[in-house]
């Protein structure tokens, strides 16, 4: 006869085993969801990483016309190769940079931190790379990856293209991609057929990538950063139509509210789109070479840009969506493709993503969050409810933008419905002092198109800037000019559901006070949590040399940057 005590003990043991099984089941599913790649792909062979990163390429791709709806300027863009990656991989609809300025954006991307967490690398002119902060290329190198790059990684700044070393640069076949429209136009003028001239440049791109692949020994996985600068101004006027058949008139009626719908600006935008088409052609060459080398199936391909359009209102150096919004698509092993993800993501999320791809645990210093849970998900649209905002900001761009060599400090929080921008020094001109606009002599057309520093120096020189400056006194354009270049309120709030072009500041309206309070609290909480120097001692770190003030000696560039054998 079995005692009741024995029966109770057996029941307890069974219950314990059941609880253990339940806990193991929960932990296994949580790990799979959060670890993404590493759990689902526990193989010996680590994937390669091909990172294609364009200078000054904002949120402009033909595939966006399809997912956002026709009627905008993306109707005119030609990006068949990016579209191909987006269709077979994951396209992120709401991707933003940490800072809409080359060097701080890249500092943030490399380290997986907000730009204000990157020390002396958090400005443009005068930046010094802080190698004490962990970044993904050295971590990959230390774990056996063959790392290399072509063209631009991190600059302007000292040492240039950190944290890569000079012997990890691959460019001996040529770098004419960086002056695409200039080079092709010159070759055509000497009798070279247009398509032949294009192919000559793209062959250089192909050759540099081949050299990088051939440098990798013992079947080591590679990480290659391709960073051409052709999308950055200056480009040849009229080249969008001449080289790519992009008719400026096709933009008529499609321009956003902050861009004048006039021939000069339409042509300028068409030329910008021409350089994007050239960039996309280079992407196609690299994807083709990857396929020929039979490496496609084990290579994570990530394509993006470092901020919005240069030399246009609301673009580069602005915290509006035209300035911080970028294209981002990912495909490769472990990625559940054919999806569009609406979660808010930041390019600081790429560093931990790359490390997890390589089976490396991201260091605790990284603020960004790996994208692998999103890449591994089978869902589309909104996936992770905690990814409901991104944080952006800026400090110094051009050192002489203001006569006293001070920055224009901004921080912002962006959600699906709103963007709130804090302008810490509203007494300053956001895009630089209006040199020679109030006390002459007026800048000439040529100066405005070619010399960024002649006036409003935090916006690149170009035909659009020239047109707006020269039209600023006309009644029909005065209001737009003042909105774009004039001093701004301490707080800006835009309702993106009603005002997608961010033209009407609602911060001062009582009806929106609760939204301002809520977003302000979230923004300040993040800034304090991540120890933003702007909040300490009235921003002393950014207001004093070397982060402010005139520049000193010329950058020593590659000094002492050879990799040790």
Can you say where each PLM-predicted feature lies in the sequence?
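Bacterial N-terminal signal peptides that target proteins for export
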Residues: 2-21, 31-32
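Formylglycine-dependent sulfatase
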Residues: 26, 32-492, 500-521, 535, ...
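A contiguous binding-surface segment within folded domains or other stable secondary-structure elements
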Residues: 495
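Short arginine-rich
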Residues: 528-531
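A glycine-rich phosphate-binding loop feature that marks nucleotide/adenosyl-phosphate handling sites
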Residues: 539-543
């Amino acid at each position: 006869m079995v005692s009741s005590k024995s029966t109770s003990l057996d029941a307890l043991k069974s219950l314990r085993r059941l609880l253990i099984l339940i806990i193991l089941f929960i932990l296994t599913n949580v790990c799979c969801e959060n670890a993404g790649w590493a759990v689902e792909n526990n193989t010996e062979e680590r994937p390669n990483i091909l990172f294609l990163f364009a200078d000054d390429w904002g949120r402009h791709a033909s595939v966006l016309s399809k997912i956002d709806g026709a009627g905008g300027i993306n109707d005119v863009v030609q990006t068949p190769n990016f579209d191909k990656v987006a269709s077979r991989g994951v396209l992120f609809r709401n991707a933003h940079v940490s800072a809409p300025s080359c060097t701080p954006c890249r500092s943030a991307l490399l380290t997986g931190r907000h730009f204000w967490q990157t020390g002396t690398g958090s400005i443009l002119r005068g930046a010094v790379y802080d190698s004490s902060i962990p970044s993904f290329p050295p971590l990959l190198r230390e774990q056996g990856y063959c790392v290399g790059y072509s063209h631009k990684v991190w600059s302007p700044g000292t040492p240039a293209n950190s944290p890569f070393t000079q012997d990890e640069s691959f460019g001996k076949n040529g770098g004419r991609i960086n002056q695409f429209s200039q080079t092709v136009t010159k070759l055509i003028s000497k009798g070279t057929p247009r398509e032949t001239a294009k192919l000559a440049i793209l062959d250089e791109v192909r050759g540099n990538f081949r050299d990088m692949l051939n440098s990798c020994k013992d079947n080591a996985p590679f990480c290659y950063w391709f960073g051409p600068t052709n999308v950055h101004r200056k480009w040849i006027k009229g080249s969008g139509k001449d080289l790519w058949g992009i008719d400026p008139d096709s933009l008529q009626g499609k321009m956003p509210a902050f861009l004048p719908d006039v021939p000069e600006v339409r042509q300028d935008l068409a030329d910008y789109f021409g350089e994007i088409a050239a960039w996309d052609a280079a992407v196609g060459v690299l994807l083709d070479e990857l396929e020929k080398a039979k490496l496609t199936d084990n290579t994570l391909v990530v394509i993006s840009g470092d901020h919005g359009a240069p030399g246009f209102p609301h673009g580069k150096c602005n915290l509006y969506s035209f300035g911080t919004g970028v294209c981002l698509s990912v495909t490769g092993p472990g990625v559940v493709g054919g999806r569009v993800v609406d979660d808010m993501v930041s390019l600081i999320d790429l560093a931990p993503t790359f490390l997890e791809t390589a089976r490396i645990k991201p260091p605790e210093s990284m603020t960004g969050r790996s994208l692998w849970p999103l890449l591994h998900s089978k869902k589309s649209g909104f996936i992770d409810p905690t990814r409901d905002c991104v944080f952006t900001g800026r400090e110094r761009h051009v050192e002489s933008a203001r006569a006293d060599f001070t920055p224009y400090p901004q921080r912002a929080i962006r959600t699906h419905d709103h963007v709130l921008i804090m302008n810490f020094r509203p007494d300053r001109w956001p895009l630089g002092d209006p040199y020679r606009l109030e006390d002459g002599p007026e800048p000439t057309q040529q100066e405005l198109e070619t010399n960024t520093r002649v006036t409003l120096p935090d916006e690149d020189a170009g035909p659009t800037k020239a047109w707006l400056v020269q039209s600023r006194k006309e009644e029909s354009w005065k209001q737009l000019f003042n909105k774009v270049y004039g001093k701004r309120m301490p707080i800006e709030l835009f309702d993106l559901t009603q005002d997608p072009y961010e033209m009407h500041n609602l911060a001062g309206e009582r009806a929106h006070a609760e939204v301002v309070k809520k977003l302000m609290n979230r923004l300040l909480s993040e800034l304090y949590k991540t120890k933003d120097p702007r909040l300490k001692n009235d921003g002393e770190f950014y207001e004093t040399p070397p982060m402010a003030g005139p520049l000193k000696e010329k950058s020593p560039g590659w000094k002492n940057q050879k990799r040790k054998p």
